[in-house]
């Protein structure tokens, strides 16, 4: 009886030892991080800055691979179906992780089942800006204007179902106002029409908005996160008027489900070490972003809560991207 018990226990101990030893030597070859968007977007610089510093620690290359399409779903699906060995990772964000599970009817993966959270990487803000001819100087005045003119104000976004769109819908719902959504194929044409007065307002990322604010072509009335931005310290957050409003743009590292806990722990520790470096924080700050290292558990909880929040907005606003 004792031998029958000891043999399986020995195998368990050996397996645990092997996993721990494997994690300590990880990585033994280049690590691929998939960005689920076309090259040249804002997440490229975020992940390349991270990857360069991980390469210094590991002595192994970090290869950034852009796999754009379907709102981030194609790249995310590539990682969901990859071997769970730590050598293929996803730089995930709200689109493929917390929005698309509700927005897309036939998603080829389940974000909370098919991925293991590793660490949050960065977070940034959107800016709510208006055409200068609009009399509103803050979000309270803006929503009062919309309430007094139901269906008269038009807001732009870079497409249906993205954070610019959903952020405005959440604000509209919380304020109890009616506005018209005008989707564009990207932020650039939306800004052209905002500056020319074809649309009245829009949410957009802070880096893309700042040049237009500084040249007074648009007026910033609020930022989308719970706290103000160091880049626009005089611009209040929406949450100062509508409590609980918090729509950050963010990214995090995810591994395929089944990746060993030891490798996830090694990745998490090294990513946190890199994100705490002063040179990386400065680099991110130049892009209007903040390094936001986290535990895997904290990222998992963020994903869970945000998925519920966006599901509520999508259903309440009857958003349909298909």
Show the residue positions of the predicted features.
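Bacterial N-terminal signal peptides that target proteins for export
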Residues: 1-9, 20
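C-terminal segment of classical bacterial N-terminal signal peptides
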Residues: 12-22
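N-terminal (or domain-start) structured segment
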Residues: 22-113, 152, 160, 176-200, ...
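An extracytoplasmic/periplasmic, membrane-proximal ligand-sensing/linker region
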Residues: 28-30, 174, 214, 261-322
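Hydrophobic alpha-helical segments typical of transmembrane helices
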Residues: 42, 46, 50, 75, ...
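Solvent-exposed, polar/charged alpha-helical surfaces in well-ordered, non-transmembrane soluble domains
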Residues: 48, 52, 56, 77, ...
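Hinge/capping helix and adjacent helix->loop/strand transition within the periplasmic-binding protein
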Residues: 81-87, 102-189, 238, 243, ...
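A ligand-binding cleft/hinge motif common to bilobed small-molecule-binding domains
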Residues: 97-106, 170-174, 201-234
